[in-house]
Curated annotation (Swiss-Prot):
This is Aspartate--ammonia ligase. SUPFAM superfamilies: Class II aaRS and biotin synthetases. One of its GO terms (molecular function) is ATP binding. The keyword Ribosomal protein does not apply. Belongs to the class-II aminoacyl-tRNA synthetase family. AsnA subfamily. One of its GO terms (biological process) is asparagine biosynthetic process.
Length: 345
């Protein structure tokens, strides 16, 4: 079901022309900073991949990819990507990228099963990035170093926005707070996972939650994660499982946390087998991507995605992602948004 958060007394700080210019400036500035911080080269990415190769991202395992037959390939099915998590690792191998360097790309996707609302659209645009690492880098301290580099690019971008539009005051804390999902559960034992995120983000402003996908002490997961890209079972922070996580910010306009990025150290052979077994998904080992990983023809890597529209929405203090990108929305949502001074593109 669709949803609509209705912020009180919302007034856009920028008109439509300023918003479009701001989007352009943010995207250009941030990707240059991201590239230099992580030593990433831009590459061209696919909008769709062949079905049955194990390349598409399964997200939480329940979302249906948009698919279509290809006439010239005997009606073989292609799938619009959900993300490029596994494709990027194949590309690192194809480009023979050295450790310490990587790639980034503009990822465009269609997620037809999204519950549409302020933060969720049918259309997903993000910077997908992947960097080659060594076995010695497969630890939580290295993960935190990479996260802090990305956050540094976010801080600089926020100041650029302030220079261009002085009415938009910087609000990001200088330091990002790290916490494991199990520690977060123990901190707020009576709250559901999403409410825990809101509580911790309201307190610190910017938070990275480590260990997304691993089972917590209550037998549940903080959130789902496909078992074949992020390593969420190897020992990490404070001897707790997980070398991955989500970066979240407190949004003053919506008065809630927003997830801007998911990232992590990727599975090696052992972690892949362990996580597939845990999820009863060992059949996937027969797929092309998984065979490549098991044959040691893919490099060890770290990677993630950063939401472009959400990042722009945060910087420009917008109440709805539809103020940043063009998409399809329920007619009743469009009418309500107009009444609230939320102008959907």
């Amino acid at each position: 079901m669709s949803y609509l958060i209705k912020p009180k007394n919302y007034k856009p700080l920028l008109d439509l022309k300023q918003t479009e210019l701001g989007i352009k400036q943010i995207k250009e500035f941030f990707q240059l900073n991201l590239s230099s911080e992580l030593r990433l080269r831009r590459v061209t990415a696919p909008l769709f991949v062949l079905k049955g190769m194990g390349i598409n991202d399964d997200l939480n395992g329940i979302e249906r990819p948009v698919s279509f037959p290809i006439k010239d390939l005997g009606d073989a099915q292609a799938e619009v990507v959900h993300s490029l998590a596994k494709w990027k690792r194949l590309t690192l191998a194809d480009y023979n990228i050295e450790p310490g360097y990587g790639i980034y790309t503009d990822m465009n996707a269609i997620r037809s099963d999204e519950e549409l609302g302020n933060l969720h659209s049918l259309y997903v645009d993000q910077w997908d990035w992947e960097r080659v690492i060594t076995n010695e880098d497969r630890n939580v301290e290295f993960l935190k170093e990479i996260v802090n580099r990305i956050y540094a690019a976010m801080i600089r971008t926020e100041y650029m926005v302030y220079e261009m539009y002085p009415q938009i005051k910087p609000c990001l804390p200088q330091k990002l707070h790290f916490i494991h999902s199990e520690e977060l559960r123990q901190l707020y034992p009576n709250l559901e996972p999403k409410c825990r995120e809101h509580a911790i983000c309201q307190k610190y402003g910017a938070v990275f939650i480590i260990g997304i996908g691993c089972k917590l002490s209550d037998g549940k997961k903080h959130d789902g994660r496909a078992p074949d890209y992020d390593d969420y079972t190897s020992t990490g922070l404070n001897n707790l499982p997980g070398l991955n996580g989500d970066l979240l910010l407190w949004d003053d306009v919506l008065q809630r946390s927003i997830e801007l990025s998911s990232m992590g150290v990727r599975v090696d052979r052992e972690a892949l087998q362990r996580q597939l077994k845990e999820e009863n998904e060992e059949e996937r080992l027969k797929l092309y991507f998984h065979k490549r990983l098991m044959d040691d023809t893919l490099p060890l890597s770290i990677g993630g995605g950063i939401g472009q529209s959400r990042l722009c929405m945060f910087y420009l203090r917008k109440a709805h992602i539809g103020e940043i990108q063009a998409s399809i929305w329920p007619e009743d949502m469009r009418k309500e948004c107009e009444e609230l001074d939320i102008h959907l593109i």
